[in-house]
Structures are given as structure tokens and as C-alpha cells.
Amino acid sequence: MGHESGHLRLTVRFAVAAALALAPNVAAAQAYQCRVPQGPVSVPAVPRDGPVRQVPVTGYTLALTWSPEYCRGREGRAADRRQCSGRAGRFGFVVHGLWPEGRGTWPQWCPAARAPTSRELAPNLCMTPSAALLAHEWTKHGACMVDAPGKYFKVSRILWNSLRWPDFDRIARADNLTAGQIRTAFAEANRHWEPEHVGLVVNERGWLKEMRLCYGRDFMPTACDRRRFGPPDSAPVKIWRGL
């Protein structure tokens, strides 16, 4: 127990140190005119969707969703109103979740001390514009990393705020765009990052859905394994810019 609690303390320290090393001089915004809600945020219940799996943490993945693609066809859905209606701002990449990784598998649904509070969720709704998703990610993934939801969201914000973004509107207009070009553009905008550190998820029609940034246990960038890397560099990829 002492060793595990020591690791929980080091998780936040490692993330802070890594973010200071990785932080760019200027970061392009990914949430345009986003407003954090002023009133209380409803804290939804989180049903478990898989088995408890407690394994040693060997690294992390910061999963980032490309909102224009996610919101295509979801603009009128109540569950996606904040992210997709435009009323709370316009979003580019947003944080899907910060996931601890294990050797050949990943930990999930570790016993959580408590659910997040409204006050813990609200400040993160420009990073992850869904209270339900924030609660889900803490319960499924975060509880396997740290001992309180506030710490999990803090580490996620530190990593998120350390990133610099190339102009994805310009990248999306490139002829014959490939996965390798997307990885290279991100790596060129972020010191210490290399293309092999950047995983991608595309749908069956070739549209970009997510970026998966791979970190070691020390929260420094590391090469993605095959499961997280996604399509080869030569694969054609399209990026939906929205209407």
C-alpha cells in the first residue's frame, strides 16, 4: 500500500515536470469562445461496461477527439449539446481521456474512493465538453492512476495545456493527405515529440476520429505500440472541417 500511494503522489509530480519540459511558447486554442458553466453541473451515474482489471501501470495515452468529425450528425442530440450545438463554443481537438496503460493490456474500473463532484467537473468542460464523459473517464481509467478525481483532472489538464497545435484547417485542405503528414505536423509543432509518438484513429471511410498521444510512465513522449499507433504513415486520411 505504501509503494502504491507513493506512486500516486509521483504521478502528479511527473506530469508537472514533464509539462514544464514540453510546454511550448505559444499554444493555439482548441476551444473557441468556450464558456465554463456558472451553475452546478449534474454528476451522472457511471455504469460499468467491462471487468475490473488491476495491472501495473507502464505508461499513458492521452486520447484526443477531433470534434468536427465526432459532431457530424450529432448536432441535435441532447447528450452532445455542449460539444456539438455551438452554444458553448466551437471545438477542435478535445480530451477524450487520459488512460493508464499496462504491459499488453490496460487497467480499468479500479475501485474508486468516490465520484467526482460538480465543482470538480465544471472547470474541465472546455477541455472535455461532456460531464458524462469526464465522470466516465475518471471512474474507468483515472481511479487506476490516482486516488481522487481532482488529481486525475489536474494531470489531464497539465498534459493538455502543454500541447501546441498546428493549423488543422490548413492541413485538412492538403491534397493526398496521409497519416504520416498529420503525425509530422504535430511533431514539428511540439518539441520532444516525434511522429512515432503520435497514434491516429480513422473511421472506415478514412476520416480522422482521434489522436492518441503516447507517454511513458514518466509522462514524457514515447513510441506508440502497434495497438495505439493506428494506420501506417502512408495511409490516406481525410479531416472533416465542419460546415
PLM regions and their residue ranges:
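Domain-level detector of nuclease and nuclease-like folds
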Residues: 76-243
